[in-house]
Amino acid sequence: MTLQQYMMFIYKWNPNRETVIIDARTHKRVEWNDLPENMNRIVLHIYPNESTITLYLGDKMEVEHE
């Protein structure tokens, strides 16, 4: 899935939520403008009771174990 497809998916299902992008290796927030072109490893976290959507750059193992 491309970054644009992710953005469309997020907006379609959660138009009123803020999207937060976190680099799983550094645990720091990344802005949309600073994302690399090739986003082939994104883990999407949507929590029903929160007002934000979190995209983690990196695979699930990195997110869970760092």
Regions found by a protein language model. Name each.
Residues 17-66:
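Detector for the mature cores of small, proteolytically processed
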Residues 1, 7-8, 39, 61:
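Detector for methionine-enriched segments
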Residues 2-23:
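N-terminal acidic leader/helix
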